[in-house]
C-alpha cells in the first residue's frame, strides 16, 4: 500500500485525557499545523481538553473518515484505543509518547515539531501492523465481538485455574489447566505476552504467539504459529468461569461450552515512523537490554 504525504491536508489529533502534558503537546502541534497551512481536526474527547473552540471536532468513530493522518499524543494504550477505531479507514497514524514505554508512540515530545515536519514532507517509514478480530459464540450464536492490536487474553475471575481446549486450524492442540492463555500479535509480543514469558516477534512477522499463563504442566510452552491461523478455544466447566478481554478492555464472561474464535482482521494499521526508527533500538531502550554495558562501552 502506498501512502503519499501530498495527501496530508486534514490532520486528526487525539490525546490521552488524564495528563496535562498531553494538552501542552497537543496545543503545540495544533498551532504548528495551522502555521504551515494544514487543517487540524480534534476527536470529540480531545476537544474537551483544549481551549480551541473554533477547530473542527469529529467523533473518534468517524475521525478516520474525514482526515488524512492522525497524530496520537499519549502512551501505547492511547494508540491502541485509536487504532481500533481508525483501522477500517486505512488512515495512517503516528504516535507522540507521553506515556511510559512508547513502543508504538515513538516520537519524543522534545522532538515533536522536527519529527512531524519530516513525516509531513514524506520522510517516514510505513509499518503495517495486523490486528485480531475476536468472536465469542454460545451454542453457535455470536454473543460478543471485538478487535485487538496487542492481544486477546483468556483469564479467570479469581486466582482459581481454568480448563479449556485449544485448537489451531481445526486441529486439536491440547487441553490445558492454567491461569489462562495470551494470544498475541507481533505488536503485542512486547506487552503482556512478554511478561508471561512469551517470545518477542519482530513487527514484520506474519505470526501469532500463544502464551500459557502459569500452566499446571511445566512442559506447556509458548507456541508460535502462522499469522493466517484460526485459533479456537473451547471452555469447560470450571469452579469459576473464565473471562476474555481484547487489548485489556472490557472483559466478557464465558460459560460452559462457549467458544472463542480469533483470526487476523481484514485491515491493517498503517503506523508511520520518522526516519531513523529502529525496532531493536526501541527494545534496547525500552527493555533495558544494554543496562550495565553502556558504561563499559564508554570506558573502552
Map each language-model feature to its residues.
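Redox-cofactor binding/interface segments in oxidoreductases and associated redox assembly factors
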Residues: 13, 72, 183
Amino acid at each position: 500500500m502506498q501512502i503519499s504525504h501530498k495527501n496530508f491536508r486534514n490532520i486528526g489529533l487525539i490525546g490521552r485525557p488524564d495528563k496535562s502534558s498531553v494538552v501542552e503537546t497537543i496545543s503545540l502541534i495544533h498551532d504548528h499545523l495551522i502555521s504551515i497551512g494544514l487543517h487540524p481536526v480534534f476527536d470529540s474527547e480531545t476537544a474537551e481538553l483544549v481551549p480551541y473552540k473554533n477547530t473542527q471536532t469529529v467523533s473518534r468513530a468517524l475521525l478516520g473518515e474525514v482526515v488524512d493522518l492522525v497524530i496520537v499524543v499519549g502512551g501505547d494504550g492511547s494508540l491502541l484505543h485509536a487504532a481500533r477505531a481508525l483501522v477500517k479507514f486505512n488512515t495512517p497514524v503516528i504516535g507522540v509518547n507521553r506515556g511510559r514505554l512508547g513502543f508504538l508512540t515513538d516520537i519524543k515530545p522534545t522532538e515533536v515539531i522536527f519529527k512531524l515536519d519530516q513525516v509531513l514532507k514524506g520522510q517516514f517509514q510505513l509499518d503495517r501492523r495486523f490486528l485480531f478480530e475476536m468472536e465469542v459464540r454460545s451454542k453457535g450464536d455470536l454473543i460478543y465481538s471485538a478487535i485487538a492490536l496487542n492481544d486477546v487474553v483468556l483469564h479467570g475471575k479469581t486466582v482459581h485455574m481454568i480448563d479449556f481446549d485449544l485448537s489451531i486450524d481445526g486441529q486439536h492442540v491440547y487441553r490445558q489447566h492454567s491461569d489462562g492463555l495470551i494470544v498475541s500479535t507481533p505488536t503485542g509480543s512486547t506487552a503482556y505476552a512478554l511478561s508471561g514469558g512469551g517470545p518477542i516477534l519482530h513487527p514484520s512477522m506474519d505470526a501469532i504467539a500463544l502464551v500459557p499463563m502459569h500452566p499446571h504442566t511445566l512442559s506447556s510452552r509458548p507456541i508460535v504459529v502462522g499469522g493466517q491461523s484460526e485459533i479456537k478455544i473451547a471452555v469447560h466447566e470450571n469452579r469459576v468461569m473464565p473471562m476474555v478481554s481484547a487489548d485489556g478492555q472490557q472483559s466478557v464472561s464465558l460459560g460452559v461450552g462457549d467458544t472463542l474464535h480469533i483470526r487476523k482482521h481484514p485491515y491493517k494499521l498503517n503506523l508511520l515512523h520518522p526516519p531513523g526508527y529502529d525496532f531493536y533500538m526501541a527494545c534496547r531502550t525500552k527493555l533495558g537490554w544494554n543496562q550495565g554495558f553502556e558504561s563499559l562501552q564508554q570506558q573502552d
